[in-house]
Amino acid sequence: MRPLLLQVGIRNVNIGERVTCVEPCNLYECTIGDDSFVGPFVEIQRGVIIGKRCRIQSHSFICEKVSISDDCFIGHGVMFVNDLFKQGGPSGNAESWKSTHIGNQVSIGSNATILPVQITNQVVIGAGAVVTKDITEPGFYAGNPAKKIRSLPK
């Protein structure tokens, strides 16, 4: 029996002006706004919307049902999750998946994990943080689970 080899690369992507994508990457059926950057070894799945002037660093995974607004930074190895494994394992039913929305001017540090949440504008997420709940006010957040550790400077 021959193996099934799926090669995706960059397929059916709505790419804005002056976007840089470094291969190898796996981008399909998503939207990437003007002046954005996507590093190598990044996967961005169908339906994802990336705003303008965003930087997605290497080895990040952005799953279906994620939207990222303008002027955001996604550090190396950041993982977005849309399935909470409520049945003890992955759900093949996309209707049970949850969405994530990232506001404007959000920076997410390397190796953070973002569960299905809403994050407001002007937030910094520390490296390695696990965001399990909505973030409704600007500031610096870190830890597992992520908690506000200080406000942004005025």
Task: Show where each model-derived region lies.
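Conserved N-terminal strand/loop that marks the beginning of ABC ATPase nucleotide-binding domains
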Residues: 14-15
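Conserved catalytic segment of ABC-fold P-loop ATPases
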Residues: 120-123, 136-138
